Amino acid sequence: MPTTICAAAARAGLACCLSLATLATAAPAAPAAPAAPGPAWVDQARLEGANSEPQNWFTAGRDQDGTYYSPLAHIDAGNVKRLGFAWAYDLGGPQRGQEATPIVVDGVMYSSGTWGYVYALDAASGKELWRYDPRGDWFAARNPCCDLVNRGVAVWKGKVYVASGDGRLHALDAATGKPVWVVDTIVDHKLPYSSTGAPQIAGDVVVIGNGGSDMGKGGVRGYVSAYDLSSGVFRWRFYTVPPAPGQRLENPELAAAAKTWDPRRDPQYKGGGTAWDGFAYDPALRLVYFGTANAAPYDLRLLGNPNLDGLYTASIIALHADSGRLAWYYQTTPNDHWDFDSVQKLILATLKIGGADRRVIMQACKNGFFYVLDRASGELLSATPFTYINWASGVDRATGRPVPTAQSDWFTSPKDVYPSWSGAHTWNPMSLSAQTHLVYIPVIDTPSVWVDLAHNGGALKFLDGFFSTNGIFPDDSYDAADLERLYGPLPALPALQAERKVKLVRELIRAWDPVARRIVWEHETSSGMRGYDGGVMSTAGNLVFQGRGSGGLWVYAADTGKVLDVINTGSHIMAAPTTYAVRGEQYVAVQVGYGGTGIAEGPVPPSSATVKFENTNRIIALKLGGGAVPTPPARRPEPFARPPEQSASKAAIEAGEVKFVEECSRCHALGINVTPDLRRLDAGLNAQFNDIVLHGILGAAGMERFDDLLSEQDVEHIHAYLIDQAWIAYRAQQAAKRP
């Protein structure tokens, strides 16, 4: 029987108890696990007994419940200052954002990197055993909203499963890395679908979703697919939103959903609701869980009636794993027009309510509420803000619906809305400690200044990734006057700051009591600018680990939040760490590298380690008694070369700025970033600019053709704008050289 810990609920007079199978501070003595039939042999029995094998990290979240908690306690508060370098492995390939948490089974580490590369390493030494290149269609590299990231693999009965960026699902032989089967999961390659999330094992099938709700002119139509674990044979598919009006509904659940969409809506808008991450599975209920993304587009007026719910977007959904039929859903954000996905990681637990055990599922949602739902029925048990919000005054317990405020309505004028479109919590994993019974959440305490581009008087009317809107971060670089030409009139920073006594843009780690529904401790991790700080792991050593963009791996006392150690890696950390043991020695490992949503928001933030050091993608492992972590090579930008002569008119340059922001800025920033700074093109690339952009002559490097979105004149204008920006930078550089 699971251990039970009781406490009084802070709201609604509910007497609650937290009961988790993993809540023992150390696993009880158990017989040694039987020898595995082969490499990477994880099955249901072994996964359910994960606490008796604390040396392994079987899933992305370690266990069936997705807690990101380890019973290992060799490294503890008393000796963590001795934690140091054990080994590092260079991932190679494109140096982009790293968001995966490595899995470790019987001394072998399995992880994924950019685009869906897979690596198998000796977990004690970092020696490469094999590496898998998924190759595929690089034209699809245009499709992900937020870099060519990948959030991990699944390991099951001798196979390693990964989804590559172009939407193919790969099953690899864990011993050799050779593909056993590969299937294409994308239903329409003409639309901007991509896959970046980790697959989910659910009974006899492997389940995968996709992304694209934000992309292109009309987004995509979300769905999840299931395939036979052994053969890759297609088993079922669940669409999360109905098709265009007049088209066939694939299942009865869509008939109910269709009533929440305008039957006259423009079919170019596909509806969104993709499931791009955050799956979970309950083997007892045989239910697979996932969250869905925002509606497409954000401006619901473009869909006709802007007051409809738009099912099943921004929802937590449970499907029967055997059939793919709907068991239940809970919509966290009906009528979503703030990009409030519900795709964040889900944690399974058990709450005792009124003397009865309630199996629950928990999520710190992008919309700022911490949800506890009965995972058998979807009944709402609690919804409590875990950070500052102003878009809603609360959740009506009678209806389960949030109560929006006047501040949330940006249709009439630009508004600062908390949380921002990036969410109060996004993909970065949170962790539930079995020792303290607290959930450790990487929190983004930031608003968006939402702008209706189509009606606010600026030159920009469309922005790839935002449709006809934009959500601007009022960070330390925010200047309303400077932004007005593109975006129209915006609120000034002092007016925005009047709402808060803290920096408008900041990130924190918060210890959250899911029973009492309150903050126990917190630390600010970034301030003034987005830091893109990392996911969280906790251990039975009374430790909480979180990496930061500044390159430090921070270690806290799990009970009090006291800072115990900071280990400098010289690399930006976004992923959650893992911990494991080999031959009795405990290791902590983390995958490092900057990218993700940050590349769409401008240059690398000044606090990031990527400003000082090259963005070398690595897995870094630590152990007691290790030394300092070797940092990547120092970043030494070449000086600006003299740009080509400018022959374009002011009007052409201004038109080029609009097109650059509209179609190019999602990947390219003018400054340090993981993609090229296009002010620094050499003579050869300047001469080939049109062929690169329109005809994709650098497609093999990930820069595919854009002749379907840009005309020859558009490209000439963009080039003129970049040359203008290059001259500005070059003149400033030359002026700085003068005595």
Question: Where are each of the predicted segments found?
Answer:
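Blade/loop signatures of beta-propeller domains
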Residues: 31-85, 244-255, 497-499, 505-510, ...
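Electrostatic cytochrome c docking/interface patches
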Residues: 42-45, 634-659
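Repeat-blade elements of multi-bladed beta-propeller folds
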Residues: 57-61, 97-117, 142-168, 194-217, ...
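Extracytoplasmic beta-rich repeat domains
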Residues: 89-101, 131-154, 182-198, 214, ...
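C-terminal substrate/ligand-recognition segments
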Residues: 100-112, 123, 425-450, 463-567, ...
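Short, conserved, GDST-rich strand-edge loop motifs in beta-rich repeat architectures
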Residues: 208-222, 263, 290-310, 414-415, ...
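Extracytoplasmic electron-transfer domains, predominantly the class I c-type cytochrome c fold
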Residues: 287, 547, 590-596, 609, ...
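Sequence/structural segment immediately N-terminal to covalent heme-attachment motifs in c-type
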Residues: 648-670, 685-695
